[in-house]
UniProtKB/Swiss-Prot annotation:
Source organism phylogeny: Eukaryota, Fungi, Dikarya, Basidiomycota, Ustilaginomycotina
Primary role: Required for the assembly and/or stability of the 40S ribosomal subunit. Required for the processing of the 20S rRNA-precursor to mature 18S rRNA in a late step of the maturation of 40S ribosomal subunits.
Gene behind this protein: RPS0
Keywords: Cytoplasm, Ribonucleoprotein, Ribosomal protein
Species the sequence originates in: Mycosarcoma maydis
Region (Disordered): 209-233, 252-276
Family: Belongs to the universal ribosomal protein uS2 family.
Subunit text: Component of the small ribosomal subunit. Mature ribosomes consist of a small (40S) and a large (60S) subunit. The 40S subunit contains about 33 different proteins and 1 molecule of RNA (18S). The 60S subunit contains about 49 different proteins and 3 molecules of RNA (25S, 5.8S and 5S). Interacts with RPS21.
Domain of life from the UniProt record: Eukaryota
Listed name of the protein: Small ribosomal subunit protein uS2
Example GO BP: ribosomal small subunit assembly
Amino acid sequence: MSKVPAALNPTEEDISLLLAAQTHIGTKNADKQMAPYIYKRRADGIHLLNIGKTWEKIVFAARILAAIENPADICVISGRQYGHRAVLKFAAQTGATAIAGRFTPGSFTNYITRSFKEPRVIVVTDPRVDHQAIREASYVNIPCISFVDSDSPLKFVDVAIPGNVRGRHSVGLLWWLLCRTVLRIKGGDLSVMPDMFFYRDPEEVEREAQEAAAAAQAAKETAEPTTEGAADVQADVPLAVAANLATETGNVDWSAEGAQDWAADGAAEQATSSWE
């Protein structure tokens, strides 16, 4: 591999992210073509991938993608569920065309289909899951970049990026690193955190939304009785009780004129008396 600018070299944080996301964890099975990318085999039979090779291939693939003038000619594909959000975020940041979910057969070979595309390069998440897209791309001479695991077949794959393609954090981080490297080569940078590329379970998202709504409703209910209750108490207090409260607290204005004419009330009572 040729020398690359210092900005594209991995930092300690990048290596820590790769290790934390378990990008180097492979499977118990290994394809013979993946031997150059396997670091060693653990005692429990799990193959460990070489993170240095992973970073080299990410930079190599990013340089290929950055060389394409029209980003829409890049087609990013993920049939695996953990990569759906990642390819959509990648397409939003770079302007590529995303296919998240089931790949429609004939999208690259049958021009009659509504989903027909003619990309210059495709990037897939898993060669086993996205085998239909890889095979069709080989029919029409479209280069293929793919993330591969220790047991992934490399048939029709032109650029293989070794990594764990079965973990939600690993898949999201690999797509995030590829997106960031492409933008850096083009002179920009990625301001989105890796968490935005991670897969999120719809049930988990809905549950979090319900919990947030319940917490907000509970906070609203606890705040309302303090004001409404005080208003109800003040409205139900009799006038005499209110006067007593005012007297006890010393808030009575003794210089003010009385609201009731006691002399007039006495005269009226004598006039209406029936004793005479």
